[in-house]
Regions:
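CE4/NodB-like, metal-dependent polysaccharide N-deacetylase domain
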Residues: 1-27, 83-85, 91-93
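Short coil/turn segments at beta-strand junctions that form active-site/ligand-binding loops
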Residues: 18-19, 169-171
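Active-site-adjacent pocket scaffolds in enzyme catalytic domains
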Residues: 25-170
């Protein structure tokens, strides 16, 4: 992991010509953090934007549990990204999230089966495959989801902004 972080940071630095200091874990899989903590510290990567309040996935390939995040728009931490420590080395700026009704995911299935130009995704990336158990949980119970500019989730932006302001977070 140490070697991978170092090589990839160098490639990114060569491309952008500036200091690289931020990170987001693919698939939101930042836990257990001790697997990457030393590599990020060694390579001066201190800003993370992986966590989203309420996020939960316990599949064989993707694990994260963000059910107990600090009630803040940003925080510092050391070895646990869910523990607010004012003198922490790392700085977390969480992804905005909102709580969704299962009906949203049924509509998402409909839009996947019958695509339109209204909610197009950017780029050519492909989301990680979700387990059937994860999908089942989404369509039968309320769950948390990230807010995005991409695709159908862009419809959350106004609601997320309103909720953010209600919490008196003023660093939007």
């Amino acid at each position: 992991i140490m070697d991978i972080v170092g090589r990839y940071k160098k490639v990114l630095t060569d491309i952008v010509g500036n200091r690289v200091f931020a990170y987001r874990a693919g698939g939101w899989c930042i836990q257990p953090f001790d697997k990457i903590e030393k590599a990020l510290k060694k390579h001066a990567i201190y800003l993370d934007s992986t966590i989203f309040h309420g996020g939960l996935n316990k599949s064989k390939t993707h694990y994260y549990n963000f059910s107990k995040t600090p009630n803040s728009s940003q925080w510092r931490f050391n070895s646990d990204p869910l523990l607010d420590e004012s003198s922490g080395f790392f700085h977390e700026i969480p992804i905005s999230s909102i709580k969704l009704n299962p009906f949203f995911f049924w509509r998402l299935v409909f839009h996947k089966l019958f695509p339109s130009n209204t909610h197009k995704q950017f780029g050519d990336g492909v989301a990680a495959k979700a387990s059937w158990l994860y999908f089942l949980r989404l369509v039968i119970s309320r769950s948390w989801s990230v807010v995005s500019l991409d695709g159908f989730k862009a419809s959350f932006l106004q609601r997320a902004y309103s909720e953010y302001k209600k919490k008196s977070f003023d660093d939007f």
